[in-house]
Amino acid sequence: MIFRDKEIFMLIPQRPPIVMVDVVWSADEQSADTGLTIQEDNIFVKDGLFREPGLIEHIAQSAAAFAGYGTFVRGEEPKLGFIGEIKDCVFNLMPPVGSELRTHTQLVTEIGGIRLINAEVRLKDELVATCVMKFFLKDD
């Protein structure tokens, strides 16, 4: 199932202007493939380029999308998540406005509500960024 535009809000708790995922190509309990088309008015664009904080937020929201997919299939609202650790981030390039990013996030492990994920951000065939992120989801 593909989620676009406002359908994204069924998977992530973020709302404009901080939404950094505009399409979810696929998602399950283990991984997600997401996308973002970088607009000129994006708050993380400077001098025509999408900067590192935006890439990190995009990765975090991509991870939230696959966590949100689990709540979606159970008929629940997406949970608020908090980043606990970011490590091994490599930024190979800063994508320009108009770029269509495609990101794959993969669950490595989950223990007690804490998730560890690997992420790869691509622009066509170019590897834009990689990152390992640990986050936890707030229980209601």
Positions of PLM-derived features:
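Catalytic strand-loop segment that frames the active site of acyl-thioester-processing enzymes
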Residues: P16-R51
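Conserved positions in beta-strands of structured domains
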Residues: D22-W25, K87, N92, Q106-V108, ...
